[in-house]
C-alpha cells in the first residue's frame, strides 16, 4: 500500500531530508563512538529539531502539536536512518509521547506533552526485562504505599536510558501491568550504561525502593 503524504507532510519530508544530509554523516557517528560519547547525540542539533517543531509532530493540535501522526514521524525517521543520526527523537517523541498519549490521564498529558514539544524533557521507555522483547515478562513490582507506590525491579536495554530525564516504567500492581513516570534521578534509581554494537545510548536500570 502506497504511503501518500499531503502537502504539509511532503514539505516536512523534504525539510528533514535536507537537514539530515547537511548536518549528519557516518563520520559523526564514528567520532562519537571513538570518543565514547555519553549522550550519543549532539545537543545543539537536537535543539534545532525542537525549534523546527519536530518534537510536536506526533501530538495532536489540541495537545499543542502539529498533528502529523505517524506519517510525520516516518517522514523524519527515514532520512535520519539514512544518515545514522543519533537524537532523542525516537525515545522521547515517539515512544515516550505515545505512551503518555495512550496511557496518561488528562493532567499527565497536558504537562508532559507540553514539555516534550518544548524540548524541556527527554524520556526513555523502560519495559524490557529479557534480552528479547517480551511484554509478558514483568517482574518489576509497584507496591501501594500511602498515596503512591514503591517500585522494585530491573529493566534491560533501555534505549536512551543513560541520559533520559524521565523514565516510563512498566511494573506489576494488584490491578495488573501499569506504567509509571519516574524521575531518572530519584533515590533508588541506578543506571548502568551499556556498550551497544550500534553505539546507541542504552542502559540497564535498577529500581530499589523507589518512591
State where each predicted segment sits.
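Amphipathic, small/basic residue-rich leader segments at the start of a protein or domain
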Residues: 1-90, 111, 115
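Short glycine/proline-enriched turns and hinge-like loops at secondary-structure junctions
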Residues: 68-70, 134-137, 160-164
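N-terminal glycine-rich flavin-associated loop
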Residues: 85-107
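A generic, well-ordered mixed alpha/beta core segment in the N-terminal half of proteins
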Residues: 103-120
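A short, Trp-centered hydrophobic/proline-enriched beta-strand micro-motif
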Residues: 119-130
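A short core secondary-structure module
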Residues: 126, 152-192
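Cytochrome P450 C-terminal beta-domain/meander region
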Residues: 134-152
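Flexible, small-/acidic-enriched active-site or ligand-binding loops
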Residues: 137-139, 143, 157-158, 183-211
Amino acid at each position: 500500500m502506497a504511503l501518500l503524504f499531503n502537502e504539509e507532510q511532503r514539505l516536512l519530508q523534504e525539510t528533514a531530508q535536507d537537514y539530515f544530509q547537511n548536518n549528519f554523516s557516518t563520520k559523526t557517528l564514528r567520532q562519537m563512538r571513538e570518543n565514547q560519547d555519553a549522550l550519543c547525540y549532539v545537543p545543539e542539533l537536537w535543539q534545532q529539531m525542537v525549534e523546527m517543531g519536530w518534537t510536536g509532530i506526533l501530538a495532536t493540535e489540541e495537545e499543542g502539536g502539529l498533528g502529523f501522526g505517524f506519517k510525520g514521524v516516518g517522514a523524519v525517521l527515514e532520512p535520519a536512518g539514512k544518515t545514522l543520526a543519533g537524537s532523542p527523537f525516537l525515545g522521547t517523541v515517539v515512544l515516550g509521547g505515545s505512551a503518555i498519549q495512550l496511557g496518561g490521564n488528562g493532567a499527565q498529558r497536558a504537562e508532559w506533552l507540553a514539555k516534550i514539544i518544548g524540548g524541556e524533557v527527554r524520556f526513555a521507555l523502560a519495559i524490557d526485562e529479557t534480552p528479547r522483547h517480551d511484554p509478558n515478562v514483568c517482574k518489576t513490582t509497584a507496591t501501594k504505599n500511602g498515596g503512591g507506590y514503591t517500585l522494585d525491579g530491573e529493566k534491560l536495554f533501555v534505549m536512551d536510558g543513560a541520559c533520559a530525564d524521565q523514565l516510563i516504567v512498566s511494573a506489576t500492581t494488584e490491578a495488573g501491568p501499569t506504567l509509571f513516570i519516574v524521575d531518572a534521578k530519584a533515590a533508588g534509581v541506578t543506571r548502568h550504561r551499556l556498550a551497544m554494537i550500534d553505539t546507541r545510548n542504552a542502559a540497564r536500570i535498577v529500581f530499589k525502593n523507589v518512591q
